[in-house]
A protein has these predicted regions:
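Catalytic core of membrane glycerolipid acyltransferases/transacylases, capturing the structured
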Residues: 51-79
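Divalent-metal-activated hydrolytic enzyme cores
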Residues: 1-45, 77-90, 95-105, 113-295, ...
Length: 326
């Protein structure tokens, strides 16, 4: 995978569409479908992740979570405002659809940073981690304003993501932070009581459904450290994206550091598109990817054939034209 970044653009595009085809075949397979159904039966909490468009922020990979379990929402810097008309509608629809099926909803509201070099942090906040954390708390308050602060059904959880080691940090209700990078594999058994102390107002079932992500992250951190010790991760912590994705439905990009994914939520879509283009340009200038082109990919998911699919095609064509003209 790491070699694909240096290939000519035509080969990279062919590789990407082959990746999408393989992902689709695997995702639709009986075994994968049954595995997802079993996982959701054991862990019924619906988990959504609000995160930055940065291609290094790949929570399913960092938590060893099967594809199709976590619902992603992406934007520049992880900057969201639930007052945005489209974002508010999408989130409300998601929550109502989950709760009507008897499921609680956990929102992971993420920010990211780098312990090795602040310049590898979040450009959307000018590498100011404190500002990013403050914004996640604002999002948490907005979610509580819309869905209630009792947290019996919808729980907004602030999470940090350290990109050098792909390590999660969980922010508790009293300001305490559980930094998984500071735990060893032998301390995995302590995660459950730590989480109970950290998040006493979180429903028991929801904590039980969050635990597999934390266990998976501990395992992933250990793998990352092994890669680092073998000098296999020197470039992976830096931007190497060569794809700009606009829209939703990019679950097949289950690969870190490949694409900058922009959700269609902000009333000002031009701003994140311009920022994404500047990151791609910087990647080319620094020699991290070839300068022979990049891919702009628009996608809109649909649930039903007929009108829903026709609208999705029209919206995808619009997003493609709009993005190309920015």
């Amino acid at each position: 995978m790491s070699e694909i970044h240096s290939k000519p653009i035509a080969q990279r595009i062919d590789w990407l569409f082959n990746l999408a085809r393989r992902h689709g075949e695997t995702f639709r397979s009986p075994e994968a479908w049954l595995a997802r159904e079993r996982y959701l039966a054991e862990h019924p909490t619906a988990i959504a992740v609000l995160k930055c468009m940065d291609g290094r922020i790949n929570i399913p990979v960092a938590t060893n979570t099967p594809t199709g379990i976590l619902m992603p929402f992406r934007n520049l810097g992880g900057i969201f405002d639930l007052g945005w008309p489209h974002l508010g509608e999408v989130l409300a629809h998601h929550v109502l659809r989950m709760t009507s099926a008897g499921r609680r909803v956990l929102f992971l509201i993420t920010y990211h940073w780098s312990k090795g070099n602040p310049q590898r942090g979040c450009a959307g906040f000018q590498y100011d981690t404190a500002a990013a954390i403050a914004h996640t708390r604002e999002i948490r308050q907005q979610i509580e304003q819309i869905f209630g602060s009792g947290h019996g059904t919808v729980y907004p959880l602030v999470c940090g993501f350290e990109t050098d080691e792909d390590a999660l940090s969980i922010h508790g209700t009293d300001g305490t932070v559980l930094d998984l990078a500071k735990l060893s594999a032998s301390e995995a058994s302590t995660l459950e009581p730590r989480l109970t102390t950290l998040l006493p107002d979180m429903p028991t079932q929801m904590r039980a459904d969050l635990l597999p992500l934390l266990h998976g992250n501990l395992e992933h951190i250990a793998q990352v450290r092994e890669q680092t010790s073998r000098h296999e991760r020197l470039l992976d912590v830096e931007h190497r994206e060569w794809v700009i994705c606009i829209g939703r439905g990019f679950d097949f990009l289950h690969t870190p550091n490949l694409a900058l994914i922009i959700g269609p939520y902000s009333p000002d879509l031009a701003d994140p598109l311009q920022k994404a283009a500047s990151i791609i340009e910087s990647n080319m200038a620094a020699g991290r990817i070839p300068d022979d082109g990049f891919l702009l990919l628009a996608s809109v998911p649909y649930d039903e054939i007929g009108v829903d699919r026709a609208r999705a095609e029209m919206k995808a064509n619009f997003l493609s034209r709009f993005s190309a003209n920015v």
